[in-house]
Amino acid sequence: MGAKQMKCLSSSSPSHTPKEEYIIAKSEDSGELVGNHTEQPQSLEDVVKSSATDPYPGPEHVVKEESSTWEEQLCAQQEQLEKEMQETRKMVSRLQALLLHGSLPEDEQTSTLSFGDTASSEQQLILTRSRLDQSMEESLDLKRELLRYKQEARNLQAVKDALQQRMSVQEDSVLQLKQELLRSSMTREELEGQNVELERKLSERNRLLSEYKKELGQKDRLLQQQQTKLDDALRRISESYHRLSGCENNGYSHMMDTSSAVFQHRMGDELQLVRDALRSLRDSFSGHDPQHHTLDTLEQGVASLVDRLHTSDTKKRPERKGSTRSPGRKANHTDRESWPSTSKIAHSHSSPVLSAAASTKVLYYTDRSLTPFLVNIPKRLGDVTLQDFKAAVDRHGSFRYHFKSLDPEFGTVKEEVFQDDAVIPGWEGKIVAWVEEDHGEGR
């Protein structure tokens, strides 16, 4: 009988139905105490019998409660159910302790159940099997929870890896943005520095421009002064020419020759004055100033004007001599023709008035102007020396002189001449030269 009762207790699981929990709770309220395993089934039967009548009140109690409202009934029932639930939980915990340890929690301090003395080996086996089943179920539950936790851990690890990957991508993006920001800041600083440099250069250019404007105004005033001097010189030349024409018309040939010589001398002085003015004006400009071309053109115009005046005077003089010569002086005709003509008088280097009978054209270039200059030297080609060329060019300072010539071995070359008495080589009946400033470099 005791074995069957123990088997019934061991087969019951820790989880009970609500009806059994209610029965167990009522049995505790009735004051029954479970003392040993043999009396446990009898107490359960008594609880079942008593529970068949206790939960439901009699007719008298129903009549008494008819006077209360349904709300109070619900509140009372709810409180009663809560109490029953608490008692049921306590009973379940006691039953679990009884199945596992063989005694109730309140009996642990007073007495301990020993199945080695009172129970048989079959009961111990049943108890061990029940404990083993419970342990296996708990192990299975733990394994399921472990698998669930592992799956959650794997999911969390995957989420973590994805988040780390996204974080690395975001960090790369942030690093790239920082690099772009650094480059943009460096570019901005560089542009700011360039702007400052450009502003400084602009202010410097503005300052230079204002200075150049001042210098240009001064040079314009100087040019006007030189132009005034040139106009005065040309006017004096014209007046001298008119006076010379008046002297030639009075019939005195001796005074005509004297006036012609005086005219040539004065004309040379006036031209020298003009050339000095142009030289001082040229020195006031820079090396590559475009005003040099204007001054060169002006100088060539004045020289050609004086040359035309001299040519016309040379042509008119024989006619006037023939018209004014008296018959009594025809005997001296041979003597007069043997006199040297004024057109063959050697001129100073300050005058470009040259003889057309025995002269050599000289075309020379300078490093200050792209336009070549043309002068005449009153000597035949082959007799012109470097001294004659310097006198014709009439430029102050240290220069180097190169002349175009034909070399038997190399063909057309530029030949530099150093000595003043050296003969200048020619090219196709004229002299082509280049005049360059000597800056002291070694030759």
UniProtKB/Swiss-Prot annotation:
Residues 309-322 have a biased composition (Basic and acidic residues). Residues 1-21, 46-68, 309-349 are annotated as: Disordered. It holds the Pfam family DIX. GO terms for molecular function: identical protein binding. Residues 357-439 form the DIX domain. It is found in: Cell junction, Focal adhesion; Cytoplasm. The keyword NAD does not apply. One of its GO terms (cellular component) is focal adhesion. One of its GO terms (biological process) is canonical Wnt signaling pathway. Residues 339-349 have a biased composition (Polar residues). Keywords: Cell junction, Coiled coil, Cytoplasm, Developmental protein, Wnt signaling pathway. InterPro entries: DIX (IPR001158), DIX_dom_sf (IPR038207), Dsh/Dvl-rel (IPR015506), Ubiquitin-like_domsf (IPR029071). Residues 71-240 form a coiled coil. It comes from the Eukaryota. PROSITE patterns: DIX. Homomers. Interacts with dishevelled and axin1. Belongs to the DIXDC1 family. Functions as a positive effector of the Wnt signaling pathway regulating antero-posterior neural patterning. The DIX domain mediates self-interaction and interaction with dishevelled and axin1. This is Dixin-A. It comes from Danio rerio. The lineage of its organism: Eukaryota, Metazoa, Chordata, Craniata, Vertebrata.
